[in-house]
Amino acid sequence: MLLSDRDIRAELASGRVTIDPFDPAMIQPSSIDVRLDKYFRVFENHRYPHIDPAVEQPDLTRLVETEGDEPFILHPGEFVLASTYEVIALPDDLAGRLEGKSSLGRLGLLTHSTAGWIDPGFTGHVTLELSNVATLPIKLWPGMKIGQLCLFRTSSPAEHPYGSPVYGSRYQGQRGPTPSRSWQNFHRTKI
């Protein structure tokens, strides 16, 4: 069940959901707007001949921080990692879904490639997978609205929420845009 603005306010007031920093003006009818932080991970395309999800590639990305009040420029065809300004914490019976903002999508900005799902129990900044599919560069201003977080109540609390040792939870407590850790539990079925 998708939570309404009333339910979102109640979950925040009870402390079961935390969003830090929280601005009540970010609550929408069935979501909470989230803002862009000032840190970005750019890909160092010259470091490796290819990307291999089975192998640790520590120099694949480099952290960039915008200067002062300057925007980050995302060029056509570019892909970077960024993160929400807010730290989000969910209880064991609420899951989240991060969606892009319609107004930004209409400019050619994709907020996430595939990883918009947030499991019950997650705590941390949400890493964004930003792509510019437009034909002109897009200015990304730290602090701008970048997406909206929808919250869903699960049919029952998760037996092993995100962060429990059962699943590995590679991104629990992440701070800033976090590079892929796929190599830590890479799975491949022999075919």
UniProtKB/Swiss-Prot annotation:
Residues 171-191 have a biased composition (Polar residues). It comes from the Bacteria. The record marks G116, W117 as: Important for bifunctional activity. Coiled coil: none annotated. Bifunctional enzyme that catalyzes both the deamination of dCTP to dUTP and the hydrolysis of dUTP to dUMP without releasing the toxic dUTP intermediate. DCTP binds at K101, S102, S103, L104, G105, R106, D119, T127, L128, E129, Q148, Y162, Q174. The gene is dcd. It holds the Pfam family DCD. This is dCTP deaminase, dUMP-forming.
